[in-house]
Amino acid sequence: MFYLFLADGFEETEALAPLDMMRRAKIEVKTVGVTGEFVTGSHGVTVKADLKPEEISFNNIDGVVLPG
């Protein structure tokens, strides 16, 4: 499982391109809203995160993505 962390002001291309590529490759990835359930990027795109930080399981983690 990979976690892609999102905070308000994230760079949409840096977050959504890797997310799209990982999902197309059937890699299990969930978005985590650091600043809330709905996170707005630097260009006004709002994304609904899959998880809240307290819902993360560190028992089966393969990696994290931290977009700018």
Where are these regions (language model features)?
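Extended, subdomain-level signal for the structured scaffold at the beginning of enzyme domains
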Residues: 1-68
